[in-house]
Amino acid sequence: MSSVYITEPPTRGKLLVHTSFGDLDVELWPNEAPLACRNFVQHCVDGTYDGTVFHRVVKDFMLQGGDPTGTGSGGESIWTKPFKDEIHTRLRFNHRGLLAMANGNQRDSNMSQFFFTLAPCEWLKGKHTIFGKVTGNTIFNLLTVSSLETNPETDRPLDPPTLK
C-alpha cells in the first residue's frame, strides 16, 4: 500500500454526493475537521447545494462548487458567518480526490464553497481545510471533469456540471 494513504487518519463518516457527471462516494474526517464536516453535511441535508453548479474547473488541479449563486462569490456557512480553518498535520494535499473548503485565500473565511482535488496540490498545505475524500471507483467520475472546456479567463465551464 502507498505510504500516501498510511499517514491519513481513519475516516468516520460517509455520504453519497449526486452530480451530473456521476455519483461520488465521499468519506469524511469529522474528528480532524468537525466544523467543515458539520457545515458540509448540513448544507447537503438542507438542500443548499441542490441544483448548484460547479462554477470553477482547473485542469489537473481542482473542481469548485458550493456557491448557491453560481458565481464563486456567494454562499454562507450554517452559522451565517465564516468559520475557522481546521488544518490537520496528517491531512495533506498529496493525492487526487480530496474534499476541502474554498476560502478565497483568506484564513478562517470558510463559508459554503468547497473543492475536490484532481491531482496532488502540495502548495495548498496549511491554506485550506481538508475534510473528506472521494473513494472507490467513483474517483473516475470526478476525473472526467478535468477535460471540460472552460472560459480561460474565469475557469468557468462552458457547460457547468451540477450537484443534484
Predicted features and spans:
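Cyclophilin-like peptidyl-prolyl cis-trans isomerases
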Residues: M1-K164
